[in-house]
Structure formats: C-alpha cells, structure tokens
Amino acid sequence: MKSIILFVLSLLLILEKQAAVMGQKGGSKGQLSSGSSRFPHRHRSQHYSGQKDKQHTESKGSFSIQHTYHVDANDHDRTRKSQQYYLNAQHKTTKSKQHLRRRQRLLNYKQKGRGRVKPKRHFHLIVIHRKGGQVHHGTQNPSQDQGNSPSGKGIFRQYSNTEKRLWVHGLSKEQASASGAQKGRTQGGSQSSYVLQTEELVVNKQQLETKNSHQNKGHYQNVVDVREEHSGKLQTSLHPAHQDRLQHGPKDIFTTQDELLVYNKNQHQTKNLNQDQEHGQKAHKISYQSSRTEERQLNHGEKSVQKDVSKGSISIQTEEKIHGKSQNQVTIPSQDQEHGHKENKISYQSSSAEERRLNSGEKGIQKGVXKGSISIQTEEKIYGKSQNQVTIPSQDQEHGHKENKISYQSSSAEERRLNSGEKGIQKGVXKGSISIQTEEKIYGKSQNQVTIPSQDQEHGHKENKISYQSSSTEQRQLNYGRKSIQKDVIQSSLSFQTEKLVEGKSQIQTPNPNQGQWSGQNAKGNSGKSADGEQDLLSHEQEGRYQQEFSGAHNTVNIEHEVAYDDLLTQQYNEDRNPIST
C-alpha cells in the first residue's frame, strides 16, 4: 500500500512539472492568455474517494490531495508530448481503477462481515480540471473514462449511505415500541442482536415469557426462557441499548440483569433465580431437609388434634376442656423395629420441637429431641384440681445378627413451670429409655407419680429373625365424680396409670405393666409369665407402698408413694440389680 501511494504521488509531481513547463511556453506565445477568451473551455472534475485499511487509517489518519491540470488542445506542436502524457495518465488510471475496485470489495466485505466501517470526515479527493476540447491522434480522455467508471462514484455513494446511518451509541434507525417495551437493534451485516427493556404490572397469576435470542448465521446460540408466576408487581429490567455496546466477533457476549420483585400484602419476597442443572448418569446426589416448628395456643372449649408422622413414630395429642374441666387423652403407639442382617447399617433420625401454652392458669413448655424415642407431657386443670395421665408404651427392639451395627440414642430435656406455686425441672438423658415427670397440685397438696415402662430387648442369635409390633388404644372419659374407663391393647408391653380426684380426695390407681420377654435359642421362643398385682387407694394423708414382683423375669419394680403437703415423691426402680433414682 505504501509503495502504491508513493508511486501515485511521484507521477502526479512529474505531471505537474510538465504542465508548468507547457504553461510557460504557451504564455510566451500569448496563446493561453488569448485562449481564455477565444475558445470555450470545459471544466470537468472527478472525485476519487478511497479508503485504506483500518489499521493504516488509524495510524496515519486521513489525507486529501487536489491536483489541477491545464491542457490546451489547440497546441499542435506539442501533440507527441501530450500523447505520451495521456498514455501515462491512462496507465495510471487503470491502476487506480484496480486499486479502487479492490478497496470497494474490502469495504463491502467489512460492512457485511464482522468488522465495522467508520465513516471518515475527510475524503480522499483527486480533482482534475481539464481545459480544452478533444485530443487528436486517437487519444482518449482519462478524465472521461474515470468519470464513467463505476468505482469512484460507487464508493462515494457508499460513503454517503454510511454517513446517513446512525452509529452513535449502538443505535440504528429502526426503533419500535410495543406495550411499554423499547427495542434497539444494531445491524452489523449477517449478525444481529436484540436488547429488551420491559416493565409490566401483573395483578393476578400470570405468566411472563421473555425470549432473548441471538441468531448467528442461521444458528441460535443463546436462548433464554423465563417463566414466572407471581401475584403482585413484577418488574424486569434489562440494560438499554445505549448503555451496552455490543461487540461483534466470533463469540457474542450478552449482559443481562434480572430482578424479580413480588409484593403480596404483608409479604416481601425477592427471588434471584440462578439454576445450573447438570444431569449425569453417575454420581447423583439428593439431599432432603425438613424442619418443623409448631406453636399452639389453646383456649376454653377448643379441641385440637395434632398428628406428627415421622419415621417409625406417631404422636397424637388431644385436649378437651368442658366447662372449665379438663380431660386429656394421650395415645402413643411407638415402634422402633430394626431387622439387621449381615453388614447392614440403618440409622433413623427424627427431631421435633413443640411449644404449648395453656390459658387455664398453667403453662407448659416441652422440648423433645429424640432419636427413635417419644416424650409426652400432659397437664390438666379442673377447678384448681389437677389430673395427669401419662401412658407410654415404648419399645426399642434390636435384632442383631452377624456383623450388624445398630446404634440408638435418645435425649430429652423437659422444663415445666406451674403457676400454682410449684416449679419442677427435669432433664433426662438416657439411651433406649423414656423419663417422665408429672406434677399435681390440689389445694396445696402435691402428688408426684412417675411411671417408666421401658424395655430394651436385644436378641442376638444366628440366622434368627424376630419382629415385634405394638399397638395401643386408649380411651378415657373423666368427669367430676365418675369412674375412669381405660382399655389398652398392647402387644409385648403394657403400662397403665389412672388417677381419680373426687372432691379434694386423691385416688391413685396403677395397674400392672406387662413385660413380654423373649428369649430364643436356635429359632425357638419362650414367653415369660406375668402376674397382676394389687390396686391400692390412697387418701391425701396416707402413705402407701405398692410393690410388684414378676415371676419368670429378672426385673423388680419398687414404687413408693408419699403424699404430704410439701413432700416430694420418691421412686426407685431396680432393673437387673441396677438402681435408678429420679
């Protein structure tokens, strides 16, 4: 390119010198001075516009050259020199035509291709003013040939067309607005890009679907589908076109910001959704998390039934209050049965948090976190007279075989505060056992009773499988002076506790907790024998002792009741000669 430009400049300087010499010789003869008035002169001008490569134009900048040639056609003595001059000019014009055609191709390619052609404020001009008429001896007019050439005019028109376009801040002439949307489109040839800016108000449940698609040579590269259902105000804002400058290249880059704002009465919810979902055939990971928090407030005359279904456990709490008289019924069938075989590991976890507030003068807070165990606390208040009933059949049965590992852990923490002048705090941490404490306040008379039916049965044999099922159904109806009816159907464990309060007199009834003990040797089971004990009625100032001894078993349960005004109840359990005091 540099060599061509230098060659053209050198030729123009030579021609200018020759024209100056010819002008001086013609002026000495007085032909040029008189010829200006005698002969009609034709002034033709041709505009050449060319463009260098983008790199060269940026490095050197634009330039403009203007040359004026004065030719006298009536000078017959200088025909040879003029003929040679025009032959050289014709040769030069042919090269300039080729050069300009090449430039036109480059311009068309850049406009259609990936590059962007910026219009130049300064054009490359070569102006030839021809003076005189026709040239003899068959010489052709180079200016006429160049005037008829489509290359120079085509480029000039092309510049005028590009100058008409709007390349400011990435905006084009085509702008459309529909439903509050502004669409800016920038064309760079075969590539096109779209920028959307939408703001809509959604009152009810509607679906908003926005697709930003970019087409590159007939292939869709980026397709974004957004489908959201909201009730409230939804606002989707994208950057407008004058803020983002789209660059065309082998890869197209989109910058998108999505903000979803949902307003629904008293709820302020902001969601930023970004999902990268990878589906593979190997190494799948699925995680589930669940948390429950329940808070209940009970008033007079309300009934509430709560059912929590977790893994292997069902807890139901029913509370009824009739005319200030409270009846509580708790029925809990709980089974943790695990059958393990060779090299099997099974672990269960369940967590529950409950907070209850009773408006009849007593407040109870119970928080139980247990694995495979259930803790229950019931409170009743009838005209200042309290009745507590706790019935918990619980079995933790472990069947271990060869190389089996099963671990159970249960922890419970209970804290109760009664407004009738008495506070009780119990914290029990045990494995496979359930600890319950009930407190009663009757006109300054306290009665405490603890009943723990707990069985930890482990059966380890070879190739033996033993399954246990326990189901309990309790139905109690307590009135002010009536008796209580209790029906319990339990397999492998029974625990009963009934309490009656009649006009300030305390009656405590404790039936027999049955224990079914299984011992198997080589797939043979022997069932133990149980004997029922006695039932004692205790008044509010008497002392009673109730002892039960079981035949065919190694367990001994000793229960002592002491009823006084401010005395505490002491209970002792001896299981397999291991004392446990609460």
From Swiss-Prot:
Residues 1-23 form the signal peptide. Disulfide bonds: none annotated. Transmembrane segments: none annotated. Residues 25-62, 131-156, 173-192, 272-477, 502-554 are annotated as: Disordered. Participates in the formation of a gel matrix (sperm coagulum) entrapping the accessory gland secretions and ejaculated spermatozoa. PANTHER family: SEMENOGELIN-2 (PTHR10547:SF6), SEMENOGELIN/SEMINAL VESICLE SECRETORY PROTEIN (PTHR10547). Belongs to the semenogelin family. This is Semenogelin-2. The gene is SEMG2.
